[in-house]
Amino acid sequence: MMQGRGRMIDVNGISLHVEDHGAGDPVLLIHGWPDSAFLWRNQIPFLVSHGFHVIAPDMRGFGRSSQPEDVAAYALRNAVADVAAILDALGLDAAHLVGHDWGAAVTWLTAMFHPGRVRKLVVLSVPHPRSPHTMRQKEMFWYQLLFQFAGIAEATIQHDNWAWLRAFSRGDGDHERWIADLSRPGALTASLNWYRANAAPRMPGPPPTLPQVTAPTLGIWSTNDYYLDGVRMEESGAYVEGPWRYEQIAGASHWIPLDAPDRLNELLLDWFR
């Protein structure tokens, strides 16, 4: 991570650690599981060098941010409220939003319910919430059932020096960073609460209608993503009223910001200009 301002911002009864760098057109980067703002270490200096004001929070439950105990605190509506509150705290009316994994779900919903706060949207890996689940997608989400079992999931993931986590990610991602972050007291449970609050089998699906996304939207999927079916991202343009563009990155894993930083940076710069 480049030198800059890392600070705590109080929002919605919790404290979020936020990386705040540069000046210019604002870009808000939202990570997913099991990451933190550190996921964006290749994007932050690049965007700052091209004249952008870059903001990257550790979302609630991750990194150095607060870990609410109540599972319901991790509902997506609260994460969306956090995004709006971060913009308020920084005195920003609107920003470009970039989201990966759970962060993509958060940015989709922010664009739907706070359209005036989103200039342009970039979603990595995760399709629009209304995109129908294919049978392949249902198979790929097997791990989300494990994550529902409090205590059992934590023990499984940590067993034998976090062997499950290493195997699950197939050698991709930030293993040592994840393990260091998730080893802090309460951190692993807090991170899994995103799944318990939003992806439990007993929960109803998204409502039959959601507001259309009016912001210009770029959807990016990578061919070695073992958790998301690319067909769903490709077809997400049906839920976007504004300009839509789909890009596929060959050979990259689920963690596009790490596996294809140069290509992602290229796409971001082109989209935001």
Task: List PLM regions with ranges.
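A short, glycine- and basic residue-enriched loop/turn
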Residues: 36-37, 105, 252-253
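Conserved HGGG/HGGXW glycine-rich cap/lid loop of the alpha/beta-hydrolase fold
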Residues: 17-66
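PAS and PAS-like sensory modules
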Residues: 6-7
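Flexible "cap/lid" subdomain of the alpha/beta-hydrolase fold that forms the substrate-access gate
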Residues: 2-3, 14-16, 26, 62-98, ...
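Catalytic histidine-centered segment of alpha/beta-hydrolase-like enzymes
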Residues: 252-261, 265
